[in-house]
Amino acid sequence: MILLSAIITIGAFVYWVSLVQSDKEVTGLAEFVPLILLAPFVLAVLIRFNYWQVIGDAVEVTENQFGDLYAQYSDIAAEMGLDKLPRLYMGNGNGVLNAFAAKCTVRRSFVVIYSDLLDLMYEHGDVNGVRFILAHELGHVKLKHVAIWRFVVNVIPEYLWIGRSVTRAQEYSADRCAMHYAPEGASSMMALYAGKRLYRRVDPIAYFASFDDHKIGFWARASNLVSTHPQGHRRMRALWAMQSEGLDHHGRML
């Protein structure tokens, strides 16, 4: 990515200089060449700024800080064959159950898991559930969902109103990755929809049946279409199906 940025920057600079030195009026797309020159630098600055905005209020997980969690995390990353272990941070969820992967530099990634999700492991003894979450986020890294080139390419789907379909597909892919490396924790994803205290009390058969009673029509599809993640019942149904049908099962997009 750095090499590509350098090539684009140098090419744009040479083109801009040739236009300026000529007597031709600079119009059209040529007017945006200075912005193209600045784009790689601006992107690098934004990545670092966002990284410090996040980790400034977080706790880094290391061998000496939540060592048992770090061991689970590093083991999964090693199984995935990741060349570099992304830094892991615990953020205060303030009641929100979430985790995400992002860039900390142009070439390196990091993962954040909220403290409320870690309650599954530390308060309820659900180590497998947390392993699944960690595998899901590392799956995003392994599948290069946080790569810079994807960020650039995803601009096009956004303009075509299909950007969120791309992110939903990525969530399904990361779930399949997690199913491969930590399948025992798949059912714990119900915590995202029933909460960290009651998720184990949810009967999956009754849960799916309650949605089967509804006709999946226009409004259900429209709601799913504008979501960055698959709706809970679709995501859980896909995970449930993968447990019996294998990783080739794909969740519904529309």
Language-model-detected regions and their locations in the chain:
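Catalytic zinc-binding patch centered on the HExxH motif and its immediate surroundings
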Residues: 91-110
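Short helix/loop segments within enzyme catalytic domains
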Residues: 63-85, 161-214, 241-247, 251-254
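Active-site recognition of the HExxH zinc-binding catalytic motif
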Residues: 73, 113, 128-145, 174-175
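Hydrophobic or amphipathic, alpha-helical segments that drive membrane association/targeting
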Residues: 1-96, 252-254
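Amphipathic alpha-helical oligomerization/assembly segments
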Residues: 232-240
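Catalytic Zn2+-binding segment of zinc metalloproteases
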Residues: 135-153, 183-186
